Amino acid sequence: MEAEEAQHGASPPISAIEEFSIIPEAPMRSSQVSALGLEAQEDEDPSYKWREEHRLSATQQSELRDVCDYAIETMPSFPKEGSADVEPNQESLVAEACDTPEHWEAVPQSLAGRQARTLAPPELWACPIQSEHLDMAPFSSDLGSEEEEVEFWPGLTSLTLGSGQAEEEEETSSDNSGQTRYYSPCEEHPAETNQNEGAESGTIRQGEELPSEELQESQGLLHPQEVQVLEEQGQQEAGFRGEGTLREDVCADGLLGEEQMIEQVNDEKGEQKQKQEQVQDVMLGRQGERMGLTGEPEGLNDGEWEQEDMERKAQGQGGPEQGEERKRELQVPEENRADSQDEKSQTFLGKSEEVTGKQEDHGIKEKGVPVSGQEAKEPESWDGGRLGAVGRARSREEENEHHGPSMPALIAPEDSPHCDLFPGASYLVTQIPGTQTESRAEELSPAALSPLLEPIRCSHQPISLLGSFLTEESPDKEKLLSVL
């Protein structure tokens, strides 16, 4: 019996367990009921003693395990309702799990091991939510160990004490029970202290969230330089926002700058358009003044325009009186202008007629074709013409011998259709093919082709083109007469 007890370990007396002031009331009640049942059965069966001790140690271990597991499970989130409803279920589950012999061997038997187990789980070292601090409770054992301070959560003390403070804490913490937050191991940081100070009120302000920079700082993921850069960016954003609401008018300054630039560009364009319009108006006004002052812009040449411009400049320098007189002179009625144009045309026609007459006389003299009534006036001018006429007559005779006689036909001026337009001109027509005739007599001066407004009567006297051939020095005089 003693060997078996040594294997399973000596179970501490119940008084040592009762000294725990932190054990919940429900596990204590269950242990008391089990102890009473065991004492009633001691006298009935002598072999039941070992079973009692074994069962008592198992129950004690399960109770301690229940306390630790319950603290771990209830710490992250507090339910709205009391924890009394949850206790029976947890106790039954833990008791069933601890009845297996494999679990008995894994459980530490000494009280110091149990104390270490209560402090061993890493979840107990997690950062507390809001401003919950660990409670320090003195603990002393009957095995001669020194007094040690054990850290416990406020939830466990509230279960044992059952005071009204626990209920108040549960009510305040029930608002955040729906959101279970998990944090990294505790690190002393100013961000956490600020967060704890702000959370002492028991409520979290709506619309305010923990910035991502602070979270990353608390987790130790950001470099100090990056933190400074992020803080500067946050200050710049706050400056952009100004007096506006959250996420509203963030880029107000940038938009205002763009609008100002657009307005400046539009103003410059408007000024340029106004200047162009003014220049156009001035140019049109000057053109209108010129049209009104001159009165006849179409009838003037370039030289006349230049002269008038020079005169206007001189008048402008001379004074306003001369300018007014010039304007009066330039404002000529249309009738006077028409009369002046008619006079100019008549004088031009008269001059052209004189020129054409002179050219006709000069051409006839050069060709040696005398007109009737003018042979006796200038006998000296026919000397050169006679020699040329003799040479021409000889060439014609040679041509007649080779090609046959040619019959020149003189067209009377009465039958000529061009008699009215070209007076004093006769046309030599040769109808015999193969003959080459000279048409110098037919050539007319360009002055004769100019149109004449007044019809000129034709002279009905026939013009003899062969008069130059009838000279005393001509040996072929008879032949020429026979031909005629």
UniProtKB/Swiss-Prot annotation:
<feature type="modified residue" description="Phosphoserine">
    <location>
        <position position="184"/>
    </location>
</feature>
<feature type="compositionally biased region" description="Acidic residues">
    <location>
        <begin position="299"/>
        <end position="309"/>
    </location>
</feature>
<keyword id="KW-0597">Phosphoprotein</keyword>
<feature type="compositionally biased region" description="Basic and acidic residues">
    <location>
        <begin position="394"/>
        <end position="404"/>
    </location>
</feature>
<feature type="compositionally biased region" description="Basic and acidic residues">
    <location>
        <begin position="266"/>
        <end position="278"/>
    </location>
</feature>
<feature type="compositionally biased region" description="Basic and acidic residues">
    <location>
        <begin position="323"/>
        <end position="368"/>
    </location>
</feature>
<protein>
    <recommendedName>
        <fullName>Rho guanine nucleotide exchange factor 35</fullName>
    </recommendedName>
</protein>
<dbReference type="InterPro" id="IPR029212">
    <property type="entry name" value="ARHGEF5/35_N"/>
</dbReference>
<feature type="region of interest" description="Disordered">
    <location>
        <begin position="139"/>
        <end position="418"/>
    </location>
</feature>
<dbReference type="Pfam" id="PF15441">
    <property type="entry name" value="ARHGEF5_35"/>
</dbReference>
<feature type="compositionally biased region" description="Low complexity">
    <location>
        <begin position="217"/>
        <end position="237"/>
    </location>
</feature>
